[in-house]
C-alpha cells in the first residue's frame, strides 16, 4: 500500500500493460497519422536492423509488427497502441529502415524524407530508439540520422542506441564491436 491506501502496482501489472499492445494504423504520409495525446516512442535504424523484431520482443507478440529477412519490408509508418485493454497509454512507432533495401532509389528517398519529417515534427514524440547492427557499428547513414534529430535531443527528446544482432557474432567479434 502507498500513502493513499491504494495498492502499489506489481511488476506483473507493468508487464501486462506493455503486453496488451495492438496494431493501430499504418500511414504512407504524415498527414495520414492520427493526432493522439499520448507519448510516442519511435524505432529507427537501417533496413533489417531489427526494428520490427524489437517491437515484437518488447510486447511479447511474435507477429504484432511484421518482421522479414528481406530488407525494406516496412514501407510505411506503423503505429502500435500500448495500454490496458481498450485504452492507449503510449504509441510504439515502427519507421521504415534507411540504407539498403530491395526497392527503387526514389522510394528510399521518399521514405527517408517522411521519416525525417516525422522525427522533426511529431509533437508527442518522447523517445527515439535507434537500432544499430553491432556487426556494422554506426554507419554514415546512422550519423546522418543523429544530425537530423540532434536539435530535438538537445531540447529533451530521449534517445537510445540499441545494438542488435550480437547473437550473429562470435566472442572475439563481440569484444571488438564493444
What is the predicted function of each stretch?
Residues 11, 103, 169-173:
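A general boundary/transition motif marking the beginning of the first structured unit of a protein
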Residues 1-102:
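Conserved G1/Walker A P-loop phosphate-binding module
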Residues 37, 63, 76, 88-91, ...:
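Helical mechanochemical/support elements of P-loop NTPase systems and associated helical scaffolds
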Residues 112-178:
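Conserved C-terminal guanine-recognition region of P-loop GTPase G domains, centered on the G4
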